[in-house]
A protein has these predicted regions:
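A conserved acidic, glycine/proline-rich C-terminal tail/linker
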Residues: 269-285
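Conserved active-site loop/cleft motifs that coordinate metal ions or position small ligands
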Residues: 268-272, 292-295
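Nucleotidyltransferase catalytic core that binds NTPs
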Residues: 21, 27-265, 273-277, 300, ...
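A structural signal for short secondary-structure junctions
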Residues: 263, 286-288
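N-terminal amphipathic/basic-hydrophobic helices that include classical n-h-c signal peptides
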Residues: 1-25
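Short, basic/aromatic-enriched C-terminal tail that caps enzymatic domains
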Residues: 279-281, 290-312
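N-terminal hydrophobic alpha-helix used for membrane targeting or insertion
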Residues: 2-6, 53, 294
């Protein structure tokens, strides 16, 4: 609670150029937008009055084709789509890249306009964590291990802000990318446990030609590191093929770990987990659908990726 309470004193950053502001951002955008809960709900209430369904795509901005694919998936499911842009301080640990995280609301809004998004929601930290805010959501289950080892506050911060956003928007469908697979399962658990009444839909990972998963943080990669980054997906696919070919989980995982250690500057984890729950699996041959997950480092940039694996 001390951590969340401290967030209430933060002044939000102007996503356009990093200047600070207090209150509603004064930004000239072409796309319909809302910066307060009341303005957001007024627009959605008018849609509901016309019998329209609502889809939601939460983002932290710095949008790329992966985000826009999620918007398209939401549009295929619903009559109207809301996308939010909010860089959530509660999911950044001390020393992480909160202040450096790219903010480009004007460019992002242009992309959302082209994707035919119907409304962009731009809450400030004063809206999301007002003075006196004293609530946080503590996640277990699929939130344990993996990303939580390196970022112990991450999923509590994600769960809290996503619960708020889902309550503010109250969509029929919310779309999250498989690129952040553990986060996807955490949010499904959150929606199920709290009876939030929203269908959580998964969007497939969008990749560069060499297999690198699109990520806003790819912008941090220098030219040499960018050349190396595509290895991660290749290593995971080789691991999946080895499992399908009858190698044990222990053998396939160890080979993938060695390949990551040879190809990257650091390795946080390489794991083979149950696809539905992220529970650990026996180290013999794969007997159930699994997910291969890895986190590695190139210089100061941390990359995560995952892929599906099936029994032989």
């Amino acid at each position: 609670l001390d951590r969340v309470g401290a967030l209430a004193s933060l002044i939000a950053y102007d996503y356009a150029d990093g200047r600070q502001f207090s209150g509603t951002p004064m930004i000239n955008l072409q796309i319909p937008h809302a910066a307060t809960v009341s303005a957001l709900r007024a627009r959605i209430r008018s849609w509901r009055g016309d019998g329209l369904s609502v889809g939601f795509v939460p983002t932290m901005g710095a949008l790329h084709q992966g985000h826009l694919a999620l918007v398209q998936l939401a549009k295929a499911q619903c009559d109207r789509v809301v996308a939010s842009i909010y860089v959530n301080p509660a999911q950044f640990a001390p020393g992480e890249d909160f202040e450096a995280y790219p903010r480009s609301v004007i460019e992002d809004s242009q992309k959302l306009t082209e994707a035919k998004c119907d409304l962009v929601y731009l809450p400030t930290t004063e809206v999301m964590y007002p003075e006196g805010f004293a609530t946080t959501i503590s996640m277990t289950g699929p939130a344990l291990g993996l990303e939580s080892e390196a970022r112990p506050h991450f999923f509590n911060g994600v769960a809290t802000v996503v619960a708020k956003l889902l309550n503010q928007v109250r969509p029929d469908v919310a779309v999250f990318g498989e690129k952040d697979y553990q986060q996807l399962l955490v949010i499904r658990q959150l929606a199920r446990d709290l009876d939030l009444g929203v269908d959580i839909i998964a969007g497939e990972t969008v990749r560069e030609n060499d297999g690198l998963a699109l990520s806003s943080r790819n912008a941090y990669l220098g030219a040499e590191d960018r050349q190396r980054a595509g290895q991660l997906n290749q290593i995971l696919k080789q691991c999946a093929a080895a499992l399908a070919g009858g190698q044990t989980i222990a053998q396939a995982r160890q080979a993938a770990l060695k390949a990551c250690q040879a190809g990257f500057d650091g390795v946080d984890y390489v794991e083979v987990r149950c696809a539905d729950s992220l529970a650990q699996l026996p180290e013999g041959q794969l007997a159930v659908p699994a997910r291969l997950l890895a986190a590695v480092r190139l210089g100061t940039t941390r990359l995560i990726d995952n892929c599906a694996a099936s029994p032989s």
